[in-house]
């Protein structure tokens, strides 16, 4: 019979094994499920016209994965909680996602963790754009290092000044029909006038107060497919979550982001962060 000490050690090893999948296990998972957001302009998107960065430059960045394949981005809030876009977890009833942290590559390196709980914002409806925010609780706590760090959050209803420059990052497409980027990329874009953005998107229902827009009038750089859920960080704070747009970095159509400050109290009440 196993000694009590041996049994305890075995239980600990099993628990750790369940929390973080090894790279060998991930290679034997099923292929990526076919998934398309209900709204054609939702940005499962990618960084267009950006530049390669190391994960240590954005250590809060995570890859949300289905069947071992990158699907969306997200941000580390603390050792147990991740913030992403609500439309990124619409598949949860069919396929349980995992999270990769601490790697510049979405398909290798770092650590892959299981989720304990997924909490979409109560104001979000499947296929809709408003309150496109969800919290993910990890089964195991993260160990922080140079490649894994939480990002700071704004306070409830903190304003965003027009022209605020932010950095957005992800593994999304660099062209509308290209393959996923293997290496993390980023770009810098300014926030734009809310009324002008709302006018640009009138045929798509407009832009709500819980959203903001960022990009250049001439287009050319921004988010694209599979960047959704990723971070928009300005002055060290996560002020936006990549949500949707019309096409990718198209002139006249800036990217639309979920406004983190509009749900700050809900994040605190739900996660304690």
Curated annotation (Swiss-Prot):
The keyword Secreted applies. Residues 23-46 form a propeptide. Gene3D superfamilies: Trypsin-like serine proteases (2.40.10.10). It catalyses: Preferential cleavage: Arg-|-Xaa, Lys-|-Xaa. The active site is at residues 87, 132, 228. One of its GO terms (cellular component) is extracellular region. Keywords: Cleavage on pair of basic residues, Digestion, Disulfide bond, Hydrolase, Protease, Secreted, Serine protease, Signal, Zymogen. It is found in: Secreted. Expressed in the midgut. Expression levels drop a few hours after blood feeding and pick up again 28 hours later. Its EC number is 3.4.21.4. InterPro entries: Peptidase_S1 (IPR050430), Peptidase_S1_PA (IPR009003), Peptidase_S1_PA_chymotrypsin (IPR043504), Peptidase_S1A (IPR001314), Trypsin_dom (IPR001254), TRYPSIN_HIS (IPR018114). Constitutive trypsin that is expressed 2 days after emergence, coinciding with host seeking behavior of the female. This is Trypsin-6. The lineage of its organism: Eukaryota, Metazoa, Ecdysozoa, Arthropoda, Hexapoda.
